[in-house]
């Protein structure tokens, strides 16, 4: 892995997609101005609706992923244009895409290169379900789970990717080995985030001896839902290099090849695996 600068964007997305697109572009531009080579957006950046079903009306067909695409898809076009205009690799959080099942969308992470062409995607596999403490979430009611474990590489760097609830399943990331950087857009609830977010992120970094970039939703949304925030960049030893507790903003950190190799050489746990 070559050394590079990564950024995590944190948002408090609203019910208005156009406002969210403007905010996304402004924050990615800010990250680029801070020297970021890669920028990761949070889950659900285009829309945090008042109801889980709101995203169905905004689901897009998957376009051909090219800058000169013939069909206009609002969210995908915004991501492509922003990557090209800012000269960054843009990991596009998640956007709602049309699925084969009526009443459900795919919750999809799209990756764009510096020319604005799509170079990867991943449909979220593990769907969040939680009830208790006056809260209930059931993503499976409105989202169709993906079937394919991601295999991504950008700038000749092998990557792992997951979305939010995927973080709780270590075998999901083991299935993506080998990789040097793990990217995770999320919208953790305040309840689960306060209890487990940092613990899980640092654990994934340590057990995979990799950098972790995690972008979150972070604040109170119009639905009354409160997301935990605390976007983080973590090194392969589990040290937190940067974090943003709440509110919109950008954090940056350098992903250093020497640091990665040092950790893996001094404690070659990945080579010692028996299972």
Enumerate the language-model features and the residues they cover.
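Extreme N-terminal starter segment of soluble prokaryotic enzymes
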Residues: 1-7
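Short polar catalytic/cofactor-binding loops
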Residues: 10-17
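Cys-nucleophile CN-hydrolase/nitrilase-fold catalytic domain and related Cys-dependent amidase chemistry
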Residues: 17, 26-115, 190-203, 208-210
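Short beta->alpha transition motifs characteristic of CBS
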Residues: 47, 53-54, 110, 121-128, ...
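CN hydrolase (nitrilase-like) catalytic-core segments centered on the catalytic cysteine
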Residues: 67-91, 158, 167-251
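Short beta-strand scaffold segments in enzyme catalytic cores
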Residues: 92-93, 108-111, 150-152, 231-233, ...
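A short C-terminal boundary segment appended to hydrolase-like catalytic domains
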Residues: 258-275
């Amino acid at each position: 892995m070559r050394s590079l600068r990564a950024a995590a964007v944190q948002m408090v997305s609203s019910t208005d997609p156009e406002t969210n697109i403007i905010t996304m572009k402004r924050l990615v531009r800010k990250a680029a101005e801070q020297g970021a080579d890669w920028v990761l957006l949070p889950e659900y950046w285009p829309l945090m609706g008042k109801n889980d079903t709101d995203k169905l009306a905004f689901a897009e067909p998957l376009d051909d992923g090219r800058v000169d695409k013939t069909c206009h898809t609002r969210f995908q076009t915004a991501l492509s244009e922003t990557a090209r205009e800012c000269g960054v690799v843009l990991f596009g959080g998640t956007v709602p895409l049309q699925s084969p099942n009526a009443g459900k969308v795919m919750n999809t992470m799209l990756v764009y290169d510096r020319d604005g062409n799509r170079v990867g995607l991943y449909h979220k596999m593990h769907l969040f379900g939680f009830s208790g403490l006056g809260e209930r979430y059931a993503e499976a009611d409105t989202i169709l789970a993906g079937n394919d474990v991601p295999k991504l590489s950008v700038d000749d760097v092998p990557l792992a990717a997951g979305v939010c609830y995927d973080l709780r399943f270590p075998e999901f990331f083991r299935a993506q080995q080998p990789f040097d950087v793990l990217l995770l857009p999320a919208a953790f609830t305040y309840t689960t985030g306060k209890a487990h977010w940092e613990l899980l992120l640092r654990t994934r970094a340590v057990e995979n001896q990799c950098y972790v970039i995690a972008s979150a939703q972070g604040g109170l949304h119009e639905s009354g839902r409160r997301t935990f925030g605390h976007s983080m960049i973590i090194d392969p030893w589990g040290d937190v290099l940067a974090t943003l507790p709440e509110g919109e903003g950008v954090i940056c950190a350098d992903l250093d090849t020497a640091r990665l190799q040092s950790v893996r050489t001094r404690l070659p746990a990945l080579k010692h695996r028996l299972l």
